[in-house]
Amino acid sequence: MKSRVNNLSLEKTDCDLCGSGNYKNLYSVPDLRFKNFKHEYSVVQCINCGHRYLSPRPSKDSMHLIYHDNYYKNRNEVDLKQKNRFILQADYLPKIANGKILDIGCAGGGFLKFLKNKGWKCYGVDFIKTKYKEKGINIKYGYLPERSFPKLFFNVITAWGVMEHVHEPSVYFEIINKILDNKGLFIFLIPNGDSLWSRWAFKEDIPRHIHFFRPKIIKEYARQYGFKVHKIYYTNKLYSRPASGKGLFKRRFLRSLDIPWVKIINNSFDLSMLKKIQYYFMKIFDALLIHPKLEELFHLCGNMVVILKKDIK
């Protein structure tokens, strides 16, 4: 992983939503998930529209360098955790006899195989070829804009944890509107950019996440690209490990002391007696004040499932 990241190409970018190049820096973090501290990546917020994104970000040609070999491990239907997630995801779909569905970011097609067994006509697209692929599932590899589908073809299009990874969400919204039928739904899971997990606990999967959507920003994307927001669900239930902000008090306290990320993640920092006492109270605050169910209740949990309808005028 380290040798691959040495070849990473970074690029500055303007706001995908409004095109403005004016932004303010919010915070910077390295790749905390895979503990690579070579680069720190800056999360910025557009001054014009408020959209948050990564800049500089990995270029599209070098994105494959930041996906660990095990990134798609155990994402087939045989894995019990994945099958439970497929059941929960399917609950968001409408009941359509012989419906045609496209799953963007389908990996090896595990969710599509699950749906095929329930009568759906299944199609998939993913920009990474995985080591496994379900048999009998029609999957095109590459980015969605590079793959063609008929206009008004699909009843439902899904994207589970995808839109935050793509360089130009605007292009995806435009294409999805064209290939979705006039009564179709676009159903997608994204991190909640207003959540404790995302905004305050530094837990976004940076640099693989390059856009940080908030409800008001999703509504603006929908308006610009011919959709209406039908429903937004705030949920921590789709994954076995909830996207909770637990730990934010500890992390933010340590960062306020200018302790490097490598020491925070490896728990190798030294504190004075006074700071140790303060750190102890931060741990108490994390335990008492932050809970996944409360985060869901107050729309502060890390994930949202968004359902968009085409806006037919």
Regions found by a protein language model. Name each.
Residues M1-V78:
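N-terminal juxtadomain amphipathic helix
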Residues Y23, C122-Y123, V229-H230:
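Hydrophobic anchor at the start of a short beta-strand
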Residues N74-L88:
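Conserved SAM-binding loop and adjacent beta-strand
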Residues E40, Y71, I137-Y141, F202-E204, ...:
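Short low-complexity, flexible loop/linker segments enriched in glycine and/or proline
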Residues C46-N48, L308-D311:
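Active-site beta-strand termini and strand-to-loop segments that position acidic
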Residues H167-I175, L185-K309:
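S-adenosyl-L-methionine-dependent methyltransferase catalytic module, highlighting the catalytic core
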Residues S3-K12, F86-F202, H209-Y225, M304-K310:
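Conserved SAM-binding loop
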Residues H39-V43, W160, L300-V306:
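Short hydrophobic/aromatic beta-strand or adjacent loop that forms the aromatic wall/cage
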